[in-house]
Amino acid sequence: MTAVSPAGTPGAPPRVPVSTYRLQLGPDLTFDDAARQVPYLASLGVTHLYLSPVLQAAPGSTHGYDVVDHTRISDELGGREGLGRLAAAARGAGLGMVLDVVPNHMAVPTPAWHNRALWSVLEEGSDSPYARWFDVDWSAGEGAVLMPVLGARLGDVLAAGELVLDEVEVPGTPGPRRVLRYYDHVFPVRAGTEDLPLAELVERQHYRLAYWRVGDEELNYRRFFDVGSLVAVRVEDEEVFDATHALVLDLVTSGVVDGLRIDHPDGLADPAQYLQRLADRTDGAWVVVEKILAGEEQVPPDWATVGTTGYDVAWRLQQLFVDPGGRSGLDAVMTRLTGAPPGGLGALVEEAKREVVAGPLYAEVHRLTDLAAAVCHDDPRLRDHTWRGLHQCLRELLVAFDRYRAYVVPGTPPRHEAVRAVEEAAERARAYLDPQRAETLAVVVDLVLGREVGSAGRRREARRDELVVRFQQVCGAVTAKGVEDTAFYRWTELVSLCEVGGEPDRFSLGVHDWHAFAQRFAALTPHALTAGSTHDTKRGEDTRAALGVLSEDAGAWSRLVDEVRAATAPYRGVLVDGLAENLLWQTVAGTWLPDAVTPDDAPDGTSEAAIAPDRLVDYLRKALREAKVATSWTSPDEAYEEAVAELARRALADPAVTGAFARWAREHREELRAASLGITLTRLTAPGVADVYQGAESYAPTLVDPDNRRPVDVDDLTERLARLDGGAPARTLADEKLLVTARALRVR
């Protein structure tokens, strides 16, 4: 790798970033591509590049969070040499680098051999030297890891001849190997079983091939939320930590990287222990965590981190620019279209979390109940608490929990905040349980808090400790899937409020509340990130700003919705529901380009200001599948989705519709300008480390991934910034935002 100067030498960037610029590396943005952007980013005024994950990911990965090899820098991005060239270019311009790290999980790739650690476990089972890496319940699977990858039940797959014994070259192993092949899926064959009849051979492996729908009910390895293709890694084991972090730690200690962003710490068994290890091995490098805080929740004080990645800033800034006076008007539109009552978000969240614990996360809740039942069965004083009763109590406690998790470390007294969070959730859960379950609920609360309960001489301490940890891990998954990834896609009062970590039921934030938050931020986490857009936000900051304008003239918005509904009535299919409609119209408004050609300017009545039809259709399909009302990822309703897509495409081609939105944009341009520039300047002058997401230094009304990962035209940004720096006037809102961003970053 090209040698670079370590942080702290003359001319090196500051150890703590002043500002960062997030780059989403991938096939369209390699290390060398990023290096070519360095002169522009230096002129923009940032101090550090903020890179998405760079370790070797699964074939075809577009984001890097599906790591398969912790010992290699991604070949597709340019390998170690490419990263060295980028680091040298950055240092030459006085910029540092921050790296995104994914400790919680690895990919279950196709073919599986790309993840050599997992391949070894599939081949050798619990005897594999890598068995300790993964969070597998070997007893539940009768010594086999469940692999739910089949498109039909195993018997049907065997009968159809779709599962075959093959011989292939497996990278990293000598000579051809016998494998089981199911289309693109390839699995190792256990030694000594190669010559068995196929059906018997399948049964003798250290993995169990199964129909994909079995995964949500019987999966015996912990995964990232409900994503079966991402298997959890046990970094709480120091040997596993060392093996999976050696390369990252070397990049930090050698000065190639100055800081780290830790992905999904709430999935880890002991986040505090993990962060302390990082701090010890990196001499206290700057580390931020992707921690989603609920309300006034703070990062636990024993975490060795400067703070979060900034979701708490992003949603508050959005609400600061929302007019509380517009709520009743927007409520009326939502109710008219969807039937959802004003103030009904709480019930919607509860409903969604119940669906999650009974559906995609049933296997995790079942495993949690098995643990609790084993603890109780082993203790005569607890034995009469039944599996069913424990399951009911755990289910209701998970649904009632109002944050991602309580941080309880086995063997240590729980913190006051953790006790309060669990006990308040139990109080809410009690209302949904038979009174006869009260004692069982009390036992569950004591168990998940790690308190003494049952016999004085407890046995199977390991199970009790595991229960404490696993409850917290499941809590985070239930909250994420139930709230962010379900309820927030169903609630359409003002969709920009349904942001990661957000509180849509608050609707707006007063100036006094913002200043109180900023003062607390400056006092407690002055070096944490302040984000506007991220790769995980549901909408980009400018999309949210544009949608906030709806609250400033809710009456006019209501009339516009009536107008476009009347215009589209002749071709709006009967399958299209109010949820899809309200989402559609708000998305068109939020992504409208304020300075592009409108129907009034175009002779054919078309509009360059409207979102491209394919972008809109792709987004609506994803959002409606996430909502899981009329369609979903696991049970897609193609007729419904096509009806919504047809409405979206025809609406964008209808001059009556685009004309109405163009009029709205003209009449509310100053409100949009104030919101976009106001949010930008407020954030860039607030306490913390200012983060700019790629392309968001200019006006960029993006949507959820993959829309927000589209390539950025850096040549255009470079030319425009040079023109503005030369004294040319800003021609558009995009120019104004670029100018404000650059001036603020340079002042910092």
Show where each model-derived region lies.
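Catalytic cores of secreted or luminal carbohydrate-active enzymes
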Residues: 715-748
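Extended, Lys/Arg-enriched charged tracts that mediate electrostatic binding to polyanionic substrates
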Residues: 124-185, 460-522, 657-658, 666-673, ...
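Conserved phosphate/anionic-ligand binding catalytic regions in large, soluble enzymes, centered on
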Residues: 398-405, 483, 527-543, 584-593, ...
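Acidic/aromatic-lined carbohydrate-recognition and catalytic surfaces
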Residues: 2-216, 222, 254, 264-331
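Extended, charge-enriched "interface" segments that sit outside catalytic cores
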Residues: 426-431, 437-448, 452-465, 528-531, ...
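Active-site cores of enzymes that catalyze phosphoryl transfer or operate on phosphate-rich substrates
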Residues: 174-248, 330-364, 534
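Polyanionic (Asp/Glu-rich) segments that form extended negatively charged tracts
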Residues: 271, 276, 285, 313-380, ...
